[in-house]
Amino acid sequence: MPNAYKRVLLKLSGEALMGDDAFGINRATIERMVADIAEVVRLGTQLAVVIGGGNIFRGVAGGAAGMDRATADYMGMLATMMNALALQDAMRHAGIEARVQSALRMDQVVEPYIRPRAIRQLEEGKVVIFAAGTGNPFFTTDTAAALRGSEVGAEVVLKATKVDGVYSADPKKDPSATRYSSISFDEAIGRNLQVMDATAFALCRDQKLPIRVFSINKPGALKRIVQGEDEGTLVHV
């Protein structure tokens, strides 16, 4: 079966790396994620990753109360760097070649973000992990995913979450909530569905870059999406 996508951008939240822990990085969880990523890479799909940092520090969280927002956001960017290095290390152990490119320079540890280099590495079959968000405060890693996905020519942004798609309401609070198989950007905005933050959402819509929302906890979901199966919710123009 030919793959439905040649190049994808996977958005992983920092919280997804915690597993059942209260904070930090759960090694078993990250190894399971890497096993799913390895399957996709071996199918021949080029894969880039944007990683969040909420498992370590979040600029808008309670721990940042009273702190200058820009300072808190820069701390969050450093948290994404830790997650990116952990992800790269787990990939190396799984036999996957991965590169970390950061929007903030830390040359002894990771490469700086250079778009042509990132594209070349993807074409060579390497996984490229984008760290430090956009490199600017006041922008989320969701926005970084929309930006990097647009820059490297990804065909879709795959947003891995704790639920298996976009629902009409919070399924944890409303048992009657229904999951959308697909929904347009305009409809999602009109219904105030929290797929991504507004800036990220608007960028994807303007660039006609679809978003596929799926559960990171569902085994094989990433592979099924790449092979064209109807997994989670597709948000489209």
Swiss-Prot record:
Catalytic activity line of the entry: UMP + ATP = UDP + ADP
GO cellular component, one term: cytosol
UniProt cross-references to InterPro entries, sorted A to Z: AceGlu_kinase-like_sf, Asp/Glu/Uridylate_kinase, Uridylate_kinase, Uridylate_kinase_bac
GO MF, any single term: UMP kinase activity
Domain of life: Bacteria
Pathway: Pyrimidine metabolism; CTP biosynthesis via de novo pathway; UDP from UMP (UMPK route): step 1/1
Key word Transit peptide present: no
Cellular location(s): Cytoplasm
Gene Ontology BP term (one): 'de novo' CTP biosynthetic process
Binding locations of UMP: G53, D73, T134, G135, N136, P137, F138, F139, T140, T141
EC number: 2.7.4.22
Activity control mechanisms: Inhibited by UTP.
Enzymatic class: transferase
Alphabetic keyword roster: ATP-binding, Cytoplasm, Kinase, Nucleotide-binding, Pyrimidine biosynthesis, Transferase
Annotated residues for binding of ATP: K11, L12, S13, G14, G54, R58, T161, Y167, D170
Key word Nucleotide-binding present: yes
Pfam (any one): AA_kinase
Assembly, per entry: Homohexamer.
Role, per record: Catalyzes the reversible phosphorylation of UMP to UDP.
PANTHER family named among the record's database cross-references: URIDYLATE KINASE (PTHR42833), URIDYLATE KINASE PUMPKIN, CHLOROPLASTIC (PTHR42833:SF4)
Homology family: Belongs to the UMP kinase family.
Name of the protein: Uridylate kinase
Gene name, Swiss-Prot/TrEMBL: pyrH
